[in-house]
Amino acid sequence: MAKREYPLERTRNIGIMAHIDAGKTTTTERILYYTGKIHKIGETHDGASQMDFMEQEKERGITIQSAATTAVWHGFFDQFAKTPYRVNIIDTPGHVDFTIEVERALRVLDGAVAVLDGAAGVEPQTETVWRQATTYDVPRIVFVNKMDKLGADFAMSVESMHERLQVNAEAIQWPIGAEDEFEAVIDLITQEAYYPVDDLGEKWEPREIPAELKELAEEKRNTLIEAVADVDDDLMEKYLEGEDISVEELKAAIRRATLALQFYPVLAGSAYKDKGVQMMLDAVVDYLPGPLDVKPYVANDPKTGEEIDLIADDSKSFAALAFKIMTDPFVGRLTFMRVYTGTLQSGSYVQNTSSDTRERVGRLLQMHATSRTEIDEVFSGDIAAAIGLKNTTTGDSLTAVDHQLILESMEFPEPVIELAIEPKTKADQDKLSNAIQKLAEEDPSFRATTNPETGDTLIAGMGELQLDIMVDRMRREFNVEATVGAPQVAYREAFTQTVQARGYFKRQSGGKGQYGDVYIEFSPNEEGAGFEFEDAIVGGVVPREYIPSVEAGLKDALNAGPLAGFPLVDLKAKLYDGSYHDVDSSEAAFKIAASLALKEAAKTAGAVILEPIMAVDIVAPEDNLGDVMGHVSARRGMIEGQESRGPVLAVKAKVPLSEMFGYATTLRSATQGRGTFQMVFDHYEAVPKNIQEEIIKNSGKEA
């Protein structure tokens, strides 16, 4: 049996999260460089980044898949040389189309580093990932990056956290200089300044704080103490009694408050200019939790339903969550897992309690972004990748065969945008099916369906960029040649009234006939609740063996709604009466009867078409406020608020997705290229009557 290399209290599982272009991947690159994982620094804008390992990532300079890597930290001044820390890092995407990747990563992390652009502060996508991290109770530290950039303003960045995130966040460092003159960092806790002594920022030396900044540094230290004392009783007591607060006491209080999600330490630096990253790594080990510091993960015993706390302990039975599936060109299908308790050896069996299958782990790997180290055993609190788990998908629970548990699975959003994809040849058709299956395993927010009317394959996802990249991957990785249609909105249909309907199917044509007869009550379900089927049959008027066929018939019929053929969603169906024939009834007959009942109900159930409504953030110069307001109202949107962000205005609005196609060009020309916008799916809503009629007409169905 292998021996644990790093104790649990010296393990950190962290994510790097941010708005697109805040410098997240560059920050991760520097972490890998300073922890000795890479020997040459790669720049994102040169397409040489180690963590961005897919072709599309290198070309576009953005991170799409969260790459997991393991690093070892000895401390800024080698203070942990004898007892180093293992830091498992997940680099997550900042583009809204990939929030599913962020959500998955946060689910298995213990702590996170939020990276801000020092010239922009909190941006729309920062708010999105911050909310996601809050949902999963992930403690965070904040790294204000790009302090060398034109317009960088550290005080503004900290203030933007107060205003836009409404959180208790204060600086634990202060930059010396900004923009071209950013040269060093003051540690507010120790009241020392740190200056780099070489070009790559590997060696730094402590110096006295410059005289002109001494007063500011003391004032900021007091602000920090007050903010932490507000949420920490021990520190508050000392502070009120006017006692001196030592470096150790302040650091311990910051750690307690950060772990309790009541305080967020803010640091300054420039990853590109090699400043501040090692101090940020020290803050990761000083203030972010190890697996023993977070509240235990809760699992359920499938036999008794009892809740069981999973505490990181190697001596307990193995339990892990599969949080990502990837296809590696060299070793094939990889299952990334977070081990919550127990250990797992390569070659052993695990029980997938989500699919109720037993699987054998071929090999275990510790992953770097593009390379891997084979390991014999993975321990509790760790992240590793397994080869050989053929039936495991994202969100599945993996446990010891003799001690089965179900870990809470992940929920994935419904796609809001789709496009038709048509393979050029029969060979491409087969390759396309394989590509779709593999890509859907990797990304559960990517779906594929067949249009029942036209037979076209439709692929769907969270945004145009995501679908662009999926089509690109089909071409590059799976050699699929296909014609791709223009993006379409993923409309849905729903009933708004409760109705009862009969489905009666009888066919007699010599020999055995067909007979099925059902009475079903249909009623609207809550938004997002999906389809619910209730069997309310009394006295066997519909025999037991045909009831699953009724449910299956309804599920099939839901794929093409009555108005325009869009999926029918959020529906309750109660089977309450019916009849059967001893000889002629069959599963197929009841399936058809159920679909006929749904068709009948649609005539009087007040069916409507639903469209995805997006939460849109538009940032534009103040002079263009009138233009932006006009854009939103012309697109059937609702303005929800606006705020000033320095020289620009940020407008928040809710706008139907169908109205947002081509908006980037409109905004660019109205603002001379200075306006930007981001959007993320918010909810589905019924379309206005006139637009519903137009959609039905375009679908080729008659209203």
Swiss-Prot record:
Q: Name one GO molecular function term.
A: GTPase activity
- Residues that, per the record, bind GTP: 18-25, 91-95, 145-148
Pfam families according to UniProt: EF-G_D2, EFG_C, EFG_III, EFG_IV, GTP_EFTU
For whether the record's keyword set contains Protein biosynthesis, the answer is: yes
Q: What is one GO biological process annotated to this record?
A: ribosome disassembly
SUPFAM superfamilies in the record, alphabetically? EF-G C-terminal domain-like (SSF54980), P-loop containing nucleoside triphosphate hydrolases (SSF52540), Ribosomal protein S5 domain 2-like (SSF54211), Translation proteins (SSF50447)
Keywords, comma-separated and alphabetical: Cytoplasm, Elongation factor, GTP-binding, Nucleotide-binding, Protein biosynthesis
User: Which residue ranges does the record assign to the tr-type G domain?
Assistant: 9-292
For whether the record's keyword set contains Hydrolase, the answer is no
The lineage's top-level taxon is Bacteria
Q: Name one GO cellular component term.
A: cytoplasm
Localisation per UniProt entry: Cytoplasm
- The primary location reported for this protein is cytoplasm
Protein family per UniProt: Belongs to the TRAFAC class translation factor GTPase superfamily. Classic translation factor GTPase family. EF-G/EF-2 subfamily.
Function, in words? Catalyzes the GTP-dependent ribosomal translocation step during translation elongation. During this step, the ribosome changes from the pre-translocational (PRE) to the post-translocational (POST) state as the newly formed A-site-bound peptidyl-tRNA and P-site-bound deacylated tRNA move to the P and E sites, respectively. Catalyzes the coordinated movement of the two tRNA molecules, the mRNA and conformational changes in the ribosome.
Protein name in the entry: Elongation factor G
Q: Which organism's genome codes for this protein? A: Leuconostoc citreum (strain KM20)
